[in-house]
Amino acid sequence: MAVCRKPLKKIEEGGAGAVHVDVMDGTFVPEVSFGQPVVRSLRPLTKLPFDVHLMVQNPERQIESFAALGADWITFHQEAAAGKEAKLIEKIHSLGKKAGISVKPGTSAETLKNFLNSADIILIMTVEPGFGGQKLIPQCLEKVRELAALRSELGLSYKISVDGGVNAQTLDSVLQSGVDIVVSGSAFFNGTLGWR
């Protein structure tokens, strides 16, 4: 795992607050990526919290495993868990982890309203999940603004995260939308984020 030390060191030195790990199953999204063996290998290499983003069908099958491997935050997609969201949030909390729920660009923020009082993190995908290096879909930031306004109006404390297409050109508009957590992969690692 020596090959993983360099990116993790860059993440730490760049001032990141967590390591975001995309887990893709090739079914919910077309790509396949990091699985349990990779997380098991990476976890001992950093003290930063691990933010595991389950872009998978049937996320309930993987929550316990990733919790046991050291995930600190576990986020699943509303679209993959329709009807089971509350149970999954409860399950993640019962394992002592922070629970996140995510939506794709085409899914309305309305689908999240019943979970805003129990989720710790609301992750808004600003690209179609599954591939890095895509352009941010600006209309998705309207969901962030809506969720930030609701949080204030209802006195809730969930964090709002944005994932996808964040780079030097989009960072300002993302930060002005009311977001708390910015996920950046391609732009961070290729040095074009323009932010350290």
Where are these regions (language model features)?
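Glycine-rich phosphate-binding active-site loops on the catalytic face of alpha/beta enzymes
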Residues: 74-82, 123-134, 177-196
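Active-site beta-loop-alpha junctions enriched in small/polar residues
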Residues: 24-26, 55-59, 79, 104-106, ...
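Alpha-helix-loop-beta-strand connector modules within alpha/beta enzyme cores
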Residues: 32-52, 91-102, 140-160, 164
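Glycine-rich, proline-tolerant flexible connector loops at the mouths of alpha/beta enzymes
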Residues: 19-36, 76-78, 127-135
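Histidine/lysine/aspartate-rich catalytic loop segments that bind and position anionic ligands
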Residues: 102-138
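Catalytic cores of alpha/beta
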Residues: 4, 58-68, 107-119, 164-182
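Conserved, mostly hydrophobic/aromatic
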Residues: 11, 22, 66, 122, ...
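Hydrophobic faces of well-ordered beta-strands that scaffold small-molecule active sites
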Residues: 19-21, 42, 50-54, 72-76, ...
